[in-house]
Swiss-Prot record:
In natural infection, inactive HA is matured into HA1 and HA2 outside the cell by one or more trypsin-like, arginine-specific endoprotease secreted by the bronchial epithelial cells. One identified protease that may be involved in this process is secreted in lungs by club cells. Palmitoylated. GO terms for molecular function: host cell surface receptor binding. Homotrimer of disulfide-linked HA1-HA2. Binds to sialic acid-containing receptors on the cell surface, bringing about the attachment of the virus particle to the cell. This attachment induces virion internalization of about two third of the virus particles through clathrin-dependent endocytosis and about one third through a clathrin- and caveolin-independent pathway. Plays a major role in the determination of host range restriction and virulence. Class I viral fusion protein. It comes from the Viruses. The gene is HA. It comes from Influenza A virus (strain A/Duck/Ukraine/1/1960 H11N9). Major glycoprotein, comprises over 80% of the envelope proteins present in virus particle. It is a single-pass type I membrane protein. Keywords: Clathrin- and caveolin-independent endocytosis of virus by host, Clathrin-mediated endocytosis of virus by host, Disulfide bond, Fusion of virus membrane with host endosomal membrane, Fusion of virus membrane with host membrane, Glycoprotein, Hemagglutinin, Host cell membrane, Host membrane, Host-virus interaction, Lipoprotein, Membrane, Palmitate, Signal, Transmembrane, Viral attachment to host cell, Viral envelope protein, Viral penetration into host cytoplasm, Virion, Virus endocytosis by host, Virus entry into host cell. This is Hemagglutinin. It is found in: Virion membrane; Host apical cell membrane. The lineage of its organism: Viruses, Riboviria, Orthornavirae, Negarnaviricota, Polyploviricotina. Gene3D superfamilies: 3.90.209.20, Hemagglutinin Chain A, Domain 2. GO terms for biological process: clathrin-dependent endocytosis of virus by host cell; fusion of virus membrane with host endosome membrane; fusion of virus membrane with host plasma membrane; virion attachment to host cell. GO terms for cellular component: host cell plasma membrane; membrane; viral envelope; virion membrane.
Amino acid sequence: MEKTLLFAAIFLCVKADEICIGYLSNNSTDKVDTIIENNVTVTSSVELVETEHTGSFCSINGKQPISLGDCSFAGWILGNPMCDDLIGKNSWSYIVENQS
């Protein structure tokens, strides 16, 4: 059990050098929404989220994300003909859905 925990800790440290979006340390009183709580006071933060997008997305563990383009998630799942170019894509790291 201890070896498993040690291995997991080492693995997480090795993978911890990559940030796509998030917060970095600095004195601040910003409030953020987390996965489990809303309006959490952060005493050390700098917003790293970009206001302009470069057009590229981070790959995770060597897998590229799938971009739905003009297709909605529901349209992709339900088989909308507009989403036919997504047929056959069976492996991705995350889904990018454009706001319309």
